[in-house]
Amino acid sequence: MKVLAALALSALAMAKPTPPMPGMSLVQTGPQETRWVTAKEKHDMVMNHIGFFDITNRPETASIASKPKSYAFPGNVSHQAEVKPLLEKISADHIKANLEKFSSYPNRYYDAQSGVESAQWVMEQAQAVVGNIQGAKVEMVKHDWMQPSIRAIIPGKSEKIVAVGAHQDSINGNNPQGEAPGADDNGSGSMTILEALTALVSDQKIAGGEAANTLEFHWYAGEEEGLLGSQDIFQQYSQEGKEVVAMLNQDMTGYGETMGVITDNSDPNLTKFTKMILDTYTSAKYSDSECGYACSDHASANKAGFPSAFVYEAVVGQDNPAIHSPDDTIEKLDPAKMAEHAKLVVGFAYELAFATL
């Protein structure tokens, strides 16, 4: 039956629909809602903060919405003695320094050379962090557009995956290849998870492959154009039968006072666990919030059948108003806020790395 299902999916994938006009994209804005849009209409959706999957190259996924597998996530933290020393290694100044470099590219657009160069820089930083760990690797994930996604893998005793992700691309909503420093959206999340990775691999058990589960850190390409990179990765994982037991998304981490714990298109059990991590390992205030359909990359994991959670910089509506413009600069951000998000990532990743799931 699995073979027949795979063949059916392959047949659907080959039978890609023809756009009404050249250059149009097929977008999905709800579980059963798809339509063709022009490039201008698509960028208007970006500017109006309308979430969507671009499924032009994956039309078969329009009707695929796998219910995430249910896991019994821990009800208590078990590794405070190991995690708290790692939190002391998180440096707001280091996050800021990395973000100054990352937001210095003219833009990080998914289909521009500067987006390729910024991805290469991320890969170099990740390689410097995990390069001496036996069995660990950092790799480019190539797509049908210029910018690759970047993936760092720190193996554990099993092939079950605990994933942390952030999109690396930026966009100018009025002119996609125009100036887009993207300091908050999403340089902040990208550098937050890089800092967390740096702290995590300083732990001898993590670096020694003693964790029960494998850790993966992802920097996605093409989020702004319809969650493109994360769709590719998680749909491929689903097709290959990989088991992602948890995914935490970090998209915008540098603005506002009260974090927003996103409760739609996410896994309620994993979200409950994430709140416990916030309470234990950070000093952050947070409130529940909703961001709508396909608002960020956790939705790609959720759609592919993997439990996901998303902690945002603020309650939706109280977030950074300068995104998708040349004004999304580092001066508007709080490095200490990003450091709190990094603490969340470290606690989340460490506790689940050693959890029996």
From Swiss-Prot:
| Molecular function terms from GO | aminopeptidase activity; metal ion binding; metalloexopeptidase activity
Signal peptide span: 1-15
EC no.? 3.4.11.-
Alphabetical GO CC annotations of the entry are: extracellular region
Intracellular or extracellular location(s): Secreted
The residues that hold Zn(2+) 1 are H167, D185, D251
Q: Does the keyword Isomerase apply?
A: no
| Family membership noted in the UniProt record | Belongs to the peptidase M28 family. M28E subfamily.
Q: How does it assemble?
A: Monomer.
Q: What is this protein called?
A: Probable leucine aminopeptidase ARB_00576
